[in-house]
Amino acid sequence: WIGPRAWLDNLDTLTIGNNVVISQGAMIIQGSHDYKKVDYPTYSKPVVLEDGSWVGAGAIVTLGVTLKSHSVLTVGSVATRDLEPYTIYQGNPAQPVRERVLVGTM
């Protein structure tokens, strides 16, 4: 599911697995500018959202990051590095806060 006002940068490959949630107002950022160079060139890196991962409302996933299987980036958090599977992350930069334990079946 992709929520309203979600921003998918589309500057590089974006891989979205099965049962992924990109909540309202979340941003997937794949590009930036090299501020060290006089001509300020752009560059990009792919982003991967593996099966069952969840990007919370208003959260930001930065370039080159992978949300591994069933990881969660909570509301308003910023992922600047890969998120480990079945782990819930919070903050800026996002830090692991607890394990994601799933119950039931799909």
Whereabouts are the PLM-identified features?
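Flexible, glycine/small-residue-enriched loop-and-beta-strand segment within the central core
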Residues: 1-67, 92-93, 97-106
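Conserved sequence/active-site signature of Rossmann-fold short-chain dehydrogenase/reductase
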Residues: 28, 78-79
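Alpha-helix N-cap/helix-start motif at helix boundaries, enriched for small hydrophobics
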Residues: 70-72, 88
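A generic "structured core" feature
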Residues: 72, 77-78
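Acidic, glycine-centered active-site loop in nucleotide-sugar glycosyltransferases
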Residues: 84-85, 90-93
